[in-house]
Amino acid sequence: MAMTYHLDVVSAEQQMFSGLVEKIQVTGSEGELGIYPGHAPLLTAIKPGMIRIVKQHGHEEFIYLSGGILEVQPGSVTVLADTAIRGQDLDEARALEAKRKAEEHIKSSHGDVDYAQASAELAKAIAKLRVIELTKKAM
């Protein structure tokens, strides 16, 4: 039987996931993180993107995170997300429209702050589309 640990994914609105998992993948402030059982304690910021949850028996779930904090402790991991949305709850048409608007905003941006904001919005839209794509494949 595969080793597991307890994972909680919570946002300000609700608890998104609570249960035993084999591993997770998430984007931290320093890059991609793979958290397996026995991982060293860690506290890091999470960048906007997705969390890939591999539950017991290899079943996968994908959740979009707008950012937050990841805490790894012996035997448990907690994700405190600013906003968290399950892949099946994301609206593909809205994500595509947000991507299009962000790309237009980048083209017409004036100044570093404007460009940085548009780039962040584009990254969020692309992350949502990726979560939608992976959720469809996992079903």
Swiss-Prot record:
CDD domains: F1-ATPase_delta (cd12152). Its main location: membrane. SUPFAM superfamilies: Epsilon subunit of F1F0-ATP synthase C-terminal domain, Epsilon subunit of F1F0-ATP synthase N-terminal domain. InterPro entries: ATP_F1_dsu/esu_C_sf (IPR036794), ATP_synth_F1_dsu/esu (IPR001469), ATP_synth_F1_dsu/esu_N (IPR020546), ATP_synth_F1_esu_C (IPR020547), ATPsynth_dsu/esu_N (IPR036771). It comes from the Bacteria. One of its GO terms (cellular component) is plasma membrane. Keywords: ATP synthesis, Cell inner membrane, Cell membrane, CF(1), Hydrogen ion transport, Ion transport, Membrane, Transport. One of its GO terms (biological process) is proton motive force-driven ATP synthesis. One of its GO terms (molecular function) is proton-transporting ATP synthase activity, rotational mechanism. Pfam families: ATP-synt_DE, ATP-synt_DE_N. Produces ATP from ADP in the presence of a proton gradient across the membrane. HAMAP family: ATP_synth_epsil_bac. F-type ATPases have 2 components, CF(1) - the catalytic core - and CF(0) - the membrane proton channel. CF(1) has five subunits: alpha(3), beta(3), gamma(1), delta(1), epsilon(1). CF(0) has three main subunits: a, b and c. NCBIfam families: ATP_synt_epsi, PRK00571.1-4. Belongs to the ATPase epsilon chain family. This is ATP synthase epsilon chain. The lineage of its organism: Bacteria, Pseudomonadati, Pseudomonadota, Gammaproteobacteria, Enterobacterales.
